[in-house]
């Protein structure tokens, strides 16, 4: 019996070569398409381009806050920092609100499970106990694969991920993060930064007239 290698294997031919060429062309086309998606896809560079849910679960656009200065905060009702921070946030909102500024609060239960309430109850709690008048949105997740995209944008932009409740992100009128604060930092540190950003915004608007 002759060895198998004595008989050459016929593994190629005109049809096989044509198929290989066609397959290569298809793969190249797919790769080019994927590269186009990667490089041509518009990069989101503004917090105000996102949609979120309000406390009632309705989808709302953050576009309405474009052109304003915003202080975005992850809040919780049953935290040792709750009283001090809610009072300080309301004070800032009341002081600077007339000058195109708003506090935007996002309840989260990922830090010590300190926000067990449904979103509507969070709003009632904050209003009844601290006189809060700024927007409080639907309860979200901040960490992990289910993180709210709008908040993820703040984290990725600033390279500052919350480690507890009441982290604060100062967002300019164009939707970019310009400053962050940890929960224990006092309002006296935050106030001048907000005032300076509002001042810049007002000057720019006057120059554009």
Curated annotation (Swiss-Prot):
Tell me the organism: Bos taurus (Bovine)
Q: InterPro entries, from UniProt?
A: Glut_perox_Gpx7, Glutathione_peroxidase, GPX_CS, Thioredoxin-like_sf
> Which family does the record assign?
Belongs to the glutathione peroxidase family.
A GO molecular function for this record?
peroxidase activity
Q: Does the keyword Zinc apply?
A: no
**Which Gene Ontology cellular component terms are annotated?**
membrane
Which terms are listed as keywords in the entry?
Acetylation, Membrane, Oxidoreductase, Peroxidase, Transmembrane, Transmembrane helix
State where it is primarily located: membrane
Annotated TM spans: 18-40
Q: Mind telling me which Gene3D superfamilies this protein's record contains?
A: Glutaredoxin
Q: Which residues carry this modification: N-acetylmethionine?
A: 1
Supply the enzyme class, top level: oxidoreductase
* Protein name (database record): Probable glutathione peroxidase 8
Q: What is the lineage of its organism?
A: Eukaryota, Metazoa, Chordata, Craniata, Vertebrata
SUPFAM superfamilies documented for this protein: Thioredoxin-like
Q: How does it sit in the membrane?
A: Single-pass membrane protein
The record's subcellular locations are: Membrane
Q: What is its EC number?
A: 1.11.1.9
GO term, biological process aspect, one: response to oxidative stress
Which residues are named in the active-site annotation?
79
Catalyses:
2 glutathione + H2O2 = glutathione disulfide + 2 H2O
